Amino acid sequence: MNKVKICGITNLDDALACAEIDVDFIGFIFYKKSPRFIDVNEAKTICEYLSNYKIKKVGVFVDEVPSKINQIADYVGLDFVQLHGAETPELVNKINIKKIKAFSVKSKGGIKYLDYNCLLYTSDAADE
């Protein structure tokens, strides 16, 4: 069965629109260099509005320390975290929430991430 994730949610209207059409996951980007970055307080407010929907909330992180990921996930009310950096398996294991690991399909080396202790994996096109 296919699952749909809409990432880069930055406002309540978009989040509610996703929930109303039964999107499976929505993503909040907590990487400050992203144009779709969202403040943790705004993400928390959106997640509180979504409490009566079955949609899963995902926090997207890039090379963040596990303690901060755990803190944000707990505060915001995330169901998953999605990791887009060069996290080692040891660091990934310190994260106390369901994990999605993203890897680049630029080379066969990206497949090494399948050895991580994650529930789901996703692949991205390589940045040029």
Task: Please tell me what each predicted stretch does.
Residues 1-4, 52-59, 96-104:
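Short beta-strand/loop segments at the ligand-binding rim of alpha/beta enzyme cores
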Residues 18, 81:
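Conserved, mostly hydrophobic/aromatic
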Residues 21, 75-76:
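Structural motif
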Residues 6-11, 60-64, 84-86, 103-106:
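Glycine-rich beta-to-alpha transition loops that act as phosphate-gripper elements at the mouths
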Residues 34-46, 85-97, 110-111:
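Active-site-adjacent beta->alpha loops and helix N-cap segments on the catalytic face
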Residues 121-128:
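Conserved small/polar residues in nucleotide/adenosyl-binding loops
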Residues 9-17, 64-72, 110-117:
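Short, acidic/polar
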